[in-house]
Amino acid sequence: MSGRDGGERTPLLEAHSLTTSDCAAGAPDPSRCLKTEASQVMAETGEGYFEAVALPPPQLPEEESAPSTAPSDPGCAGTFQIRAGGDGGYVVPEARLEPAPPPTESLETASVSLATDDSLGNGCQPGEPQGLSREKPLETCGAEKLGSDLMAEAKAEEVKTEEGPVFSVAVDEEVVGKEGAKEEEGVEQGMEVEERPVGEEIEMVENRVVEEAGHRPLRMDLRMNPLEAIQLELDSVNAQADRAFQQLEHKFGRMRRHYLERRNYIIQNIPGFWVTAFRNHPQLSPMIRGQDAEMLRYITNLEVKELRHPRTGCKFKFFFRRNPYFRNKLIVKEYEVRASGRVVSLSTPIIWRRGHEPQSFIRRNQEVVCNFFTWFSDHSLPESDRIAEIIKEDLWPNPLQYYLLREGVRRARRRPIREPVEIPRPFGFQSG
C-alpha cells in the first residue's frame, strides 16, 4: 500500500470479521493475525454467527479527498466502520449484524468462537500494538462489545431451542416405551387367560357372586341404621310421655279421690245398689244366676285401683257385710302384668260356710258359663279376664247409669240426687 500521491494500491481484504482488526504490516503480533484468518474462514464457510459482507469498490481520487466523516449509505446504517489510514485514510465498512444459521456443534467451531471472543476482549485493551489503525475510536470499541453481547445472547437462545426439542423427544420416547410395556402386559394377561382352564374361571365367577352376596347385608345395615336411630328417638319420646302421664295421673288422681270417697259414702247408704247395677249390665247379667244374685245383695262397696304404674295391673276390692254364705268381709282380685308380658291373676280365697258352696259352672246349650263367684277362685277360664275388663272399663267409671235402668228410673226421678255426680271418664282417670 503506497501513499496518497502515487503508486498502486494494494487490494483491500474482501471480508472483515466484526470482531477483528486488520493485520497491517506494522502489526508485530502474529497470533492476532492467525486469529483474524480463522475468523475470516469461519465467515466464509458460514460457521460463524455473522455473515461477511463484500466491501464496495475503491473510491476515486476526488472522493478520497472527502472527509472521512461523510454520512454513509442509509441502507448501511446498521454497519460498523473502521478507519484504515492515519490522517486521511478512508473508512472501511465492516459486516452487518445478521443472524446466521445455527453452527454445527464441533470442537473447531468452539475454538474459533473462543479465539474471536479473545480478539474482542483484546481489541479495546489499552497498550496493544496498533499498526495501521493506531487511533481506534470509542465507537468501534462499543460496537465490538455490542457484538460480543449479541453473540452471547444468540448462544443462549440456541441452547434454549436445542434443549426444548431434546426434552420433548425424551418425553415422547418415555411415553412410547410405557405404551409398549402396557401392550406387552395386556398380551401376557390375554395369554394367561387363554391358558387358564374352564374350572378356574368358574371358581372366579363363584367367588365374585359370594363377595357380592356378602356386601348386600352391609347395604341393608346402611338402611337400617337410620331406622334404628328413629326408633330410639321414638322410644325416648314415649318414655317422656309415660313419665308426664304418670305425673298428671298422680296430680288429677288426688283431685278425683275426694269425689270418689263421697260417691262411695252415698252408695253404701243405698241398699242393693251394686247388685242392681250388676244385674242391669247387659254383659254381666248372664253370669249372675240364682245363689249369685243372693250373695251380691250383701255388697256394700266396690273399689277399683290401679297399681303404681297404670300398665302393670289393677286391683278389685269387694266389701261385704255379714251374710250366711261366707265369712269374708273383703275379697280382693288382682291382675298383674309381669316383665315378660304375661298376665297373672291372684285372689283372696273365699271361706264358705257349710252347705253354701256355689256351683262352679252352669251348662247352657253344651257351653260352659262361668259363675260370678267362680271368677274369684278360678284363674284359668278366659271369661275371667273378660269380667275384669268389663268392670274396670264400663261399670266402675259410671255405675249410676246401670242403676237407673228399668225399675230404678222412677225412684231416681222422685228423689233427685243432691250430691254431685262425676262425669263418665276412661278408667285410667278413675283411680282412687
From Swiss-Prot:
SUPFAM superfamilies: NAP-like
Subcellular localization: Nucleus, Nucleolus
One Pfam family of this chain: NAP
PTMs per UniProt: Ubiquitinated by the CRL2(APPBP2) complex, which recognizes the Arg-Xaa-Xaa-Gly sequence at the C-terminus, leading to its degradation.
Segments of this protein annotated with the region Disordered: 1-31, 54-110, 116-135
Listed Gene3D superfamilies: 1.20.5.1500, Nucleosome assembly protein
Top-level taxon of the source organism: Eukaryota
Entry-linked InterPro entries: NAP-like_sf, NAP_family
GO biological process: nucleosome assembly
Site of covalent link Glycyl lysine isopeptide (Lys-Gly) (interchain with G-Cter in SUMO2): 160
Keywords assigned by UniProt, alphabetized: Isopeptide bond, Nucleus, Ubl conjugation
Keyword set includes Nuclease: no
GO CC terms: chromatin; nucleolus; nucleoplasm; nucleus
One MF annotation (Gene Ontology) recorded for this entry: histone binding
Membership in a protein family: Belongs to the nucleosome assembly protein (NAP) family.
PANTHER family: TESTIS-SPECIFIC Y-ENCODED PROTEIN (PTHR11875)
Protein name: Testis-specific Y-encoded-like protein 1
Organism, scientific name: Bos taurus (Bovine)
Lineage: Eukaryota, Metazoa, Chordata, Craniata, Vertebrata
